[in-house]
Amino acid sequence: GGRFDLGVGIGYRQLEFDQFGRKISHRPSLVEEGIEILRRAWSGEPVNFEGKRFSVGDLCITPTPKRAPKVLLGGMAPPAIDRAARIADGFLCTGGIGMDVYVEALKNNGKSPEEGNIILGCWAIIAEDPEAEAANVGEHVLYQSNEYIRWGAFGPPDQTPLFPDA
């Protein structure tokens, strides 16, 4: 036991929600209810849950983990970072964005900073010849960066979708 941690995020591409018939505006409650259902299922007891987004009856999973996996929650907007401090075992931090906000959110949720867990996501090249390896992966890194840019929201402030509840 203890070899698996679950990292989750609430999503941000409309396509992700369309494919499951879900509303993107329901992201916060979807992830909160989903995490609650998972935690209860890992306990080994049958789960009966009726929420705003999910309805589960007599859900059982086997084998039951010896130790429930840690749930790590990502996000960049202050509400998402607060959610990580409130309901998760750690914060998936992209490029260092939001670390200070997370520490404050822990305090605001009655937790000490020592109870927090920050997992930093960033590119790292570990190789005998980092420059040669960077040349090999550069095309792939650029592709990923361009995809994130393409998926982004662009336009004048009054016409660009915002996710204040993220």
Describe these PLM feature segments.
Residues 1-166:
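Active-site-adjacent structural elements that line small-molecule/cofactor binding pockets in enzymes
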